[in-house]
């Protein structure tokens, strides 16, 4: 994310680029174009951004790396964009004018929809990039509707037209039928070969409106993203809506009221270019000596401390995590390093929430809130890769709304927090609306999967040779493996997007796992009563395979309250104590066997069963086994 090179001090480039004399602010604003690219994973967005950078001459051919903006190794490896990025480019159009193009990158995955809404809010236009061989995906549809709601000018673009499998006519028809844009206006390009890039840049300049705003008004700048830099502290990526941001100004963060002094301003081209001011309509970075991570909340508004704006930039909501999991370091010595790593990560990721948690089985760790499963995987992988931590993650859960008999409403993030059954009046589970686009030949398998996940069909319509399905289903059913299984039953052709709808009453119970009579809090799950018996049986069988045999018998039980619904037993290892007896009286052997039996009984009372790490993932594997 516009981040700095990891080795050595940041390389600075200063220069006369992007001059914006304040007397000509309004004239200059007319030559700014702020735009975003909406695209599904792997439809060529990062490659197109590279072509723009190359075309404007911002980097020499030697400096161009593939996917310049995807600066995290993880982003390049998985081929997805996770963070919002920005790059400012100069483009001399055919009308002879030089335009400033501010491209704000957006992630494409469903988990990162909040990052998309922030990026789109800072733009006046968007390019809808669709792979000409694959067609429109559910994800792009959702992000495109967000852009339409925010009043952006949308330019449809067909990418990868150089592929033999591309079918532009079919995709144009899809764009018209599914999204409702005029497909005939779609531009045909190949980001890989550079074909059609010039025409696309001209269309950007002609069709995307210039930013609106009052250069004379009080400063109002939206924080699109922020990240932590080892040299500079917090760096914020901002879009100026009104007024101007100048070096040396005292600025105020509107939600917290905290004040800072601007030390550095500038753009990414994608090199860092320092400037003395950012004017209305411009996008750039601000360094203001913010040392702690909560100093620049993403989605907040910066204003002048001397002459503050009356109201912040509208339309931003605090993002709510939907999926929770306990994350614990394997070594308790790493706890403080783990806390620091999470705090640093949270600066780059406003949607990550965490609070300390103690588990009898796993020790000290954190209960972390994520946007979805991909978000959870990426956070865990970044913690392990960038901070060298070794972590155990418990099975993910969703938030449940619980009405107690006292009339109190609780939000439960962790099954172990659920009150006793006699204290619960009602449990409500989160329901989502899942939009699925699937080719006709796979629709039967997809419907079967949705029904298995307790889904209720709300809509079904034919769109060319694709079928658009809308299902309402419990989020708890989706969170573990729905996405993987959807890809599996549709041979990888189905695409999926979801949004939270409401909490709805359901007959849910907590299944506890007891090992030798002791509850293991990290293995508890909340499931529908109809599935409790089979889920408990699968869980105990799985744990029986994983827990090693001890010198004494180990009982594994699944229980709802005090009612045991399933049990497995790990048989004891047995030493042959009578081996040293040869012949002789049977009472001698019996005495040795009785002694062994008494010893095992005593051992069972005081012995602790070591639970291996894989046991905590067994909850996940129980679901995967069904796929």
UniProtKB/Swiss-Prot annotation:
GO terms for molecular function: GTP binding; GTPase activity; guanosine tetraphosphate binding; ribosome binding; translation elongation factor activity. GO terms for cellular component: plasma membrane. Residues 1-23 are annotated as: Disordered. The keyword Plastid does not apply. Keywords: Cell inner membrane, Cell membrane, GTP-binding, Hydrolase, Membrane, Nucleotide-binding, Protein biosynthesis. GTP binds at residues 42-47, 159-162. Residues 30-212 form the tr-type G domain. It is found in: Cell inner membrane. It is a peripheral membrane protein. InterPro entries: EF-4, EFG_II, EFG_III/V, EFG_V-like, EFTu-like_2, G_TR_CS, LepA_C_sf, LepA_CTD. It comes from the Bacteria. Pfam families: EFG_C, EFG_III, GTP_EFTU, GTP_EFTU_D2, LepA_C. HAMAP family: LepA (MF_00071). Belongs to the TRAFAC class translation factor GTPase superfamily. Classic translation factor GTPase family. LepA subfamily. This is Elongation factor 4. It comes from Alkalilimnicola ehrlichii (strain ATCC BAA-1101 / DSM 17681 / MLHE-1). The lineage of its organism: Bacteria, Pseudomonadati, Pseudomonadota, Gammaproteobacteria, Chromatiales.
